[in-house]
Amino acid sequence: MKLCVALDLSTKEECLQLAKELKNLDIWLKVGLRAYLRDGFKFIEELKKVDDFKIFLDLKIHDIPNTMADACEEVSKLGVDMINIHASAGKIAIQEVMTRLSKFSKRPLVLAVSALTSFDEENFFSIYRQKIEEAVINFSKISYENGLDGMVCSVFESKKIKEHTSSNFLTLTPGIRPFGETSDDQKRVANLAMARENLSDYIVVGRPIYKNENPRAVCEKILNKIHRKNISENDIEQNYEVIQQKEWDMCNHFEEWIKTQPDKEHALKEFYAKCGIKY
């Protein structure tokens, strides 16, 4: 699983400063529509000068097939590593985009947007007359069969997409709140444990990182959880009965206690050690 940091700040200078703070970390950067319209293609070049970041250009391209292919060709010339288009543009548009990009010796990954994470079931149904999961699976099959590399989806559809396509079909999941932060304008949000459980290949995290006074520390904490076998909430639930059998008075108040700990990882290590369970 890869961490993709959303550069959704108010100015180019703030975005570049954040990128500088995150140098030498194993991360991707996401440049969205706002930053691209405001700062232009030269912003991509400036980011590359800060560090050799992998860049996801998140423009969600959606138009008639030829226009989509033209747009994808142009942004691919920028040397970005991933782009996305709307799956609802249809099979012909997807085919035309992939045919156009086949001439590149090294093309970017192309993912299809399924259902925006700002949708809930009611609002999605009012437009598409389908349930979210049903539509996402349909979009995913069309995208997979016509040569795309993966899907942009919520965590809740990630595993289902792979079941209906291939384990190698990538899923990028926005709306990640790694440590239980507020969901803001996102409706279908999830944490790191859920992203891992549902086989997300890329997770997008924005506000929990760039609104923190120490964004690098937050990134490092997320990366630490990604790159090791972390004790997830599921692990805690599965071992809870075992833990309760141990004579340690914190067991009965575990959930309340862990929330009060400034260094949760260290606290969990001590907790498991006292309970005689291997960390």
From Swiss-Prot:
<dbReference type="GO" id="GO:0006207">
    <property type="term" value="P:'de novo' pyrimidine nucleobase biosynthetic process"/>
</dbReference>
<keyword id="KW-0456">Lyase</keyword>
<feature type="active site" description="Proton donor">
    <location>
        <position position="60"/>
    </location>
</feature>
<dbReference type="InterPro" id="IPR018089">
    <property type="entry name" value="OMPdecase_AS"/>
</dbReference>
<feature type="binding site">
    <location>
        <position position="186"/>
    </location>
    <ligand>
        <name>substrate</name>
    </ligand>
</feature>
<feature type="binding site">
    <location>
        <begin position="58"/>
        <end position="67"/>
    </location>
    <ligand>
        <name>substrate</name>
    </ligand>
</feature>
<protein>
    <recommendedName>
        <fullName>Orotidine 5'-phosphate decarboxylase</fullName>
        <ecNumber>4.1.1.23</ecNumber>
    </recommendedName>
</protein>
<comment type="pathway">
    <text>Pyrimidine metabolism; UMP biosynthesis via de novo pathway; UMP from orotate: step 2/2.</text>
</comment>
<dbReference type="InterPro" id="IPR011060">
    <property type="entry name" value="RibuloseP-bd_barrel"/>
</dbReference>
<feature type="binding site">
    <location>
        <position position="207"/>
    </location>
    <ligand>
        <name>substrate</name>
    </ligand>
</feature>
<feature type="binding site">
    <location>
        <position position="177"/>
    </location>
    <ligand>
        <name>substrate</name>
    </ligand>
</feature>
<feature type="binding site">
    <location>
        <position position="117"/>
    </location>
    <ligand>
        <name>substrate</name>
    </ligand>
</feature>
<dbReference type="GO" id="GO:0005829">
    <property type="term" value="C:cytosol"/>
</dbReference>
<comment type="similarity">
    <text>Belongs to the OMP decarboxylase family. Type 1 subfamily.</text>
</comment>
<dbReference type="InterPro" id="IPR013785">
    <property type="entry name" value="Aldolase_TIM"/>
</dbReference>
<dbReference type="GO" id="GO:0044205">
    <property type="term" value="P:'de novo' UMP biosynthetic process"/>
</dbReference>
<dbReference type="InterPro" id="IPR001754">
    <property type="entry name" value="OMPdeCOase_dom"/>
</dbReference>
<feature type="binding site">
    <location>
        <position position="206"/>
    </location>
    <ligand>
        <name>substrate</name>
    </ligand>
</feature>
<keyword id="KW-0210">Decarboxylase</keyword>
<dbReference type="Pfam" id="PF00215">
    <property type="entry name" value="OMPdecase"/>
</dbReference>
<dbReference type="InterPro" id="IPR014732">
    <property type="entry name" value="OMPdecase"/>
</dbReference>
<feature type="binding site">
    <location>
        <position position="8"/>
    </location>
    <ligand>
        <name>substrate</name>
    </ligand>
</feature>
<feature type="binding site">
    <location>
        <position position="30"/>
    </location>
    <ligand>
        <name>substrate</name>
    </ligand>
</feature>
<keyword id="KW-0665">Pyrimidine biosynthesis</keyword>
<dbReference type="InterPro" id="IPR047596">
    <property type="entry name" value="OMPdecase_bac"/>
</dbReference>
<comment type="subunit">
    <text>Homodimer.</text>
</comment>
<dbReference type="GO" id="GO:0004590">
    <property type="term" value="F:orotidine-5'-phosphate decarboxylase activity"/>
</dbReference>
<comment type="function">
    <text>Catalyzes the decarboxylation of orotidine 5'-monophosphate (OMP) to uridine 5'-monophosphate (UMP).</text>
</comment>
